[in-house]
């Protein structure tokens, strides 16, 4: 019989005094791939969390969560992917990796047109991943907590990188 091992671990750091929340989730399928997600948030209204958890009506709880998200801020987001053989299997039938790289580069240029440095770094990371198929990392670290409701306007205005530093790595 074939043995298939899946692992999942998570850690949560919830500081009610500071109103901060952090979580790290690790997921892996032995012999295929592993992924890690790290998320750090600030300006969490603990009273709203309690209010939402005590709500007896789902609509009331959703409204409280919506109010809470108006003030929630991002401090960090990191994603790491380590490949064993999953990418090899998924990409085995791709007729031309160079064409896939070109298509991804076009999408990146459209999405990150205002951010040429980050676009170049992301294209290099994706190219490195597609050529070596071993790992990929992305991180976004706020210089100071950035409101989740501010992200869209910062992105559109071209000011996102004034508030958040981005790093991309592929190998």
Name the predicted role of every residue range.
Residues 1-171:
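Glycine-rich, small/hydroxylated-residue low-complexity segments
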């Amino acid at each position: 019989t074939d043995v298939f091992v899946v692992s999942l671990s998570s850690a949560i750091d919830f500081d009610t005094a500071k109103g901060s929340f952090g979580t790290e989730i690790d997921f892996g399928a032995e012999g295929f791939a592993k992924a890690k997600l790290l998320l750090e948030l600030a300006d969490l209204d603990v009273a709203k969390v309690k209010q939402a958890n005590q709500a007896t009506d789902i609509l009331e709880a959703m409204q409280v969560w919506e109010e809470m998200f108006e003030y929630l801020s991002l401090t960090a987001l990191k994603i790491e992917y380590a490949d064993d053989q999953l990418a090899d299997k998924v990409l085995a039938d791709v007729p031309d990796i160079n064409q896939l790289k070109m298509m991804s580069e076009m999408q990146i240029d459209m999405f990150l047109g205002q951010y040429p440095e980050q676009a170049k770094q992301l294209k290099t990371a994706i190219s490195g991943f597609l050529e070596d198929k071993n790992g990929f990392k992305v991180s976004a670290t706020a210089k100071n907590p950035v409101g989740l409701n501010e992200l869209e306007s910062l992105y559109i205005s071209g000011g996102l990188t004034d508030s958040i530093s981005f790093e991309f790595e592929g190998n």
